């Protein structure tokens, strides 16, 4: 039996207006149907996304995070800390959903 790819999904349950909670099943279902075994971690405090990413990134094939720019920063910083070249996905769910400045 072929082993499934593993994915870490880190999300901030309080980011923005906490609307991510109503979409969790749909998000996880998409990745499961895509062949991933999904490890789900809702952040509990500032810095939690960083620590969980450092802990689990060496064990997964993909990291996806959802939240605001702080959540994205923690996950990217965690990957950099352990020097893991794991693809990363981002589902914006912060109050402004604009992690990068624009010239518009």
What is each of the regions a protein language model found here?
Residues 2-104:
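Small-residue-rich beta-alpha loop regions that form the catalytic core of phosphotransfer
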């Amino acid at each position: 039996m072929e082993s499934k790819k593993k994915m870490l999904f880190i999300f901030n349950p309080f980011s923005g207006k906490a609307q991510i909670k109503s979409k969790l099943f749909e998000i996880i279902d998409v990745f499961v149907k895509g062949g991933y075994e999904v490890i789900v971690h809702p952040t509990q405090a500032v810095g939690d996304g960083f620590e969980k990413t450092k802990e689990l990134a060496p064990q997964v094939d993909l990291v996806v995070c959802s939240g605001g720019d702080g959540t994205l920063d923690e996950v990217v910083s965690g990957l950099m800390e352990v020097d893991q070249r794991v693809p990363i996905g981002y589902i914006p769910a912060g109050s402004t959903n604009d992690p990068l400045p624009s010239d518009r």
